[in-house]
From Swiss-Prot:
Compartments, as annotated in UniProt: Secreted
Function statement: Cecropins have lytic and antibacterial activity against several Gram-positive and Gram-negative bacteria.
Pfam family, one: Cecropin
Family of this protein: Belongs to the cecropin family.
Name the record gives this protein: Cecropin-C type 2
């Protein structure tokens, strides 16, 4: 094999190894977004019956 082919193989191996280490930061961001979504869902779950009750009183 010539040098160019070896260089490409080594570069691809390095990119694969470095690319997998980035998942830690993305995982943390995903967890934060998931937590925010859960809080919004829980707040909406608590508020919707109150809103529905207020609409029923207005009729």
């Amino acid at each position: 094999m010539n040098f160019a082919k070896v260089f490409v193989l080594v570069a691809m191996a390095v990119l694969l190894l470095v690319g997998q280490s980035e998942a830690g930061g993305l995982k943390k961001l995903g967890k934060k977004l998931e937590g925010a979504g859960k809080r919004v869902f829980n707040a909406a779950e608590k508020a919707l019956p109150v809103v529905a009750g207020a609409k029923a009183l207005g009729k």
